[in-house]
Every structure is written in structure tokens, then in C-alpha cells.
């Protein structure tokens, strides 16, 4: 992992400086997201997360930032990841996604995306974990 250049303060400052609206909308997947008026999405900077970018693109809305946090999305919908990444102004990928990507995808991520250190690791709950949290 020593060759990974993680997002830093300068990158964050650049993202902030490149905003075109005062407000930024974080657009997630789900039925309530689609209740957001298109007029609002068209006039604000939008951060799309995982598969939510499809809805935006289907309405000709380019996301300010595309964020991929779920490695399963990359494995199951790789072509969509590339499409969403290439059609957004910026792409941020969680390091967990990078670590589980193919070598080809890792090269793409390092060349075209900002890589974010993990705040937490997604874990599957097993019997021991469930017992641990119930005690």
C-alpha cells in the first residue's frame, strides 16, 4: 500500500474551490432520493454515492463528485463504475475498494481517482460477533 497517494488537505481544498454552488447535495440510492426535485439537483453540486449516479445521468445531471465506497459495486457493476467515474468531475474511491480491485482497476483508480483512507471496515456479523454485542 505504500504506492497509494491518499487524498490530502490540498485535494480537499481543491474540491472546495471547484464547487459551483453554495450547497452540495449528497445523493444516495433509494426511493426517497428520487423525490428530490430535478430542478434542485440541476442547480446544485451533487455528490453521487455508489449506484445513485445512474439516476443523475439518466436526467443529464453530471455529478460534482462520484464516491465509490462498496467494493461489491465495482465487482458487480464495473462498467457502471467506469461510466460514472468518467462522467463526474471528480471521483473518490475508498481504500477498501482499491485493495480489492483487480490490477487493471487499481491502475485506473490511481490515475483517475482520489483515494480515501477508511474510517471503518465493513465486517460481516458472525455468531461470535452477535454474541459479543449482545452481552
Set out the residue ranges of the language-model regions:
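N-terminal donor/sugar-recognition subdomains of glycan-related enzymes
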Residues: 1-26, 31-43, 58, 86-91, ...
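Acidic/Gly/His-enriched mid-domain segments of enzyme catalytic cores or analogous surface patches
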Residues: 42-45, 51-135
Amino acid at each position: 500500500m505504500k504506492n497509494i497517494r491518499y487524498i490530502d488537505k490540498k485535494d480537499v481544498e481543491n474540491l472546495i474551490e471547484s464547487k459551483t454552488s453554495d450547497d452540495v447535495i449528497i445523493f444516495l440510492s433509494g426511493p426517497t432520493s428520487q423525490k428530490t426535485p430535478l430542478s434542485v439537483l440541476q442547480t446544485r453540486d451533487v455528490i453521487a454515492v455508489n449506484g445513485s449516479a445512474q439516476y443523475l445521468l439518466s436526467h443529464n445531471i453530471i455529478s460534482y463528485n462520484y464516491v465509490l465506497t462498496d467494493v461489491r459495486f465495482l465487482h458487480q457493476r464495473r462498467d457502471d463504475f467506469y461510466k460514472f467515474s468518467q462522467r463526474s468531475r471528480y471521483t473518490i474511491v475508498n481504500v477498501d475498494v482499491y485493495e480489492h480491485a483487480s490490477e487493471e482497476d487499481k491502475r485506473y483508480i490511481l490515475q483517475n481517482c482520489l483515494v480515501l483512507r477508511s474510517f471503518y471496515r465493513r465486517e460481516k456479523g458472525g455468531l461470535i460477533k452477535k454474541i459479543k454485542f449482545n452481552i
